[in-house]
Amino acid sequence: LIRNWIDLFNCETVTYLLEPIEGHGLWDRKKVFGELPTKSDYEGQIAVLTRATIRLSKLKQFWKNVDGVASKMAGSEGFINSYGIGEIPWIKQATFSIWQNKQAMKNFAYQMKDHQEVIQKTRKENWYSEDMFVRFKITGCTGTVNGVNPLKVKL
């Protein structure tokens, strides 16, 4: 049935094969990837899932800060691609991003001023009722985005 819709709308699909290597936090009060170390030695191509449940009283502050950070992520060194995922639109949000290596991802996450400021605001102003951060080793990728396999273009 899904294949019929994909064909009808001429949609592209891409599938990433992933191995969770490090992370922390909960998804609906569960450790959905099991017990993970908070750090690993893996430094290669990496995918990151950041997921949060935003407090209703903090929605305006959260969304006011999204566009500025998202636009800078796309131009960051080592950035390959990202996908926004809305489990419950506007409230339960996730970003799945792919990077050439862990260092490039960390440079964006912890060295880019705008992102650093947003991280500080989320903690200081208690934006989230729950959050989860998981990093994955990418073991494979099939399909296309805009006509190309996103990992083959950047290799």
Briefly describe each language-model feature range:
Residues L1, D7-A94, Q103-K113, D131-L155:
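Short S/T/G/P-rich N-terminal loop/turn motif that feeds into the first structured element of a domain
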Residues G86-I88, V118, N126:
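Acidic/histidine-enriched, beta-strand-rich ligand/metal-binding domains
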